Amino acid sequence: MKLISWNVNGLRACVQKGFLDYFHAADADFFCIQESKLQEGQIALDLPGYHQYWNYAGKKGYSGTAIFAKHEPLQVTRGIGTAICDTEGRVITLEYDSFYLVTCYTPNSVSYTHLTLPT
């Protein structure tokens, strides 16, 4: 099984720079992307042999994830059941008979308080 995960930092720009050539050459079973920065309907990818699962952010030009899978899952879950995360399109989970595949784009921790341990 071949899995690729890539933070594309904007899929439209990435497509213009050769993403599809790499995608097809890689021939991965699962291709996960983070930070797609897309809204529904902004791009149509022709990926024969792949099922496409998208989780869009509510905010334009922000976050978003996708999984392109050769194998159709039993179930697809978008989000984790927490409104603050789910409106940002950060998580997709695919359920299969013997495993779960999760792609996650985590928030930047700059705005959070960090625990500093003594040295």
Label the predicted regions.
Residues 1-47, 57, 62:
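N-terminal, active-site-proximal structural segment of metallo-dependent hydrolase catalytic domains
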Residues 17-20, 94, 115:
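Conserved CoA-thioester-binding segment of acyl-CoA-metabolizing enzymes
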Residues 37, 42-111:
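Structured beta-strand-rich core segments of catalytic domains in phosphoester-bond hydrolases
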Residues 113-119:
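Conserved small/polar residues in nucleotide/adenosyl-binding loops
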